[in-house]
Amino acid sequence: MKNFLVKTIANAGALAVAVWLLDKITLTGGSTGEKTLTLIVVALVFGLVNMVVKPIVQVLTFPLFILTLGLFTLVVNALMLLLTSWVADKLDLSFHVDGFWTAVLGGLIVSIVSWALNAFLPDGD
C-alpha cells in the first residue's frame, strides 16, 4: 500500500512537471488546492491505466518493441497518457492532453521525472 502511495505521489509530481513544461497539456482550475487534488486524482487514474492497460498493450505490440529496439515504448507511454486524458475528461477532471505528439513529449517527461522521483523516494515495503 505504501509503495502504491509513493508511486502515486511520484506520478503526480511527474504530471505536474509535464503540465508546467508543455503548453498543450493543461490543468485548469481555481485554486492551487483544487489543482493539487486534481493532479492526485489524475495520478491515480494514470497509475491504474499503467497497471491494467499497459501490460496488455505491451504484450500485443511486442514485435514492434523488438523491431524498434524499445523505442515503441514512447508510443505506448503516449497512448497511456492520452487514455488518462480521456478518462479524466469522462470524470470531469480538468486535465487535458492536446494531440499525439504532445502526448509523446509528455510521456517522455513523465517517464524521466517519475523515474528520478522514484529513485529518491523511499520504497515503502
From Swiss-Prot:
The keyword Membrane applies. InterPro entries: Phage_holin_4_2. Its main location: membrane. Keywords: Cell membrane, Membrane, Transmembrane, Transmembrane helix. One of its GO terms (cellular component) is plasma membrane. Coiled coil: none annotated. It holds the Pfam family Phage_holin_4_2. It is a multi-pass membrane protein. The chain crosses the membrane at residues 9-29, 33-53, 56-76, 100-120. It is found in: Cell membrane. This is Uncharacterized protein SCO3922. The lineage of its organism: Bacteria, Bacillati, Actinomycetota, Actinomycetes, Kitasatosporales.
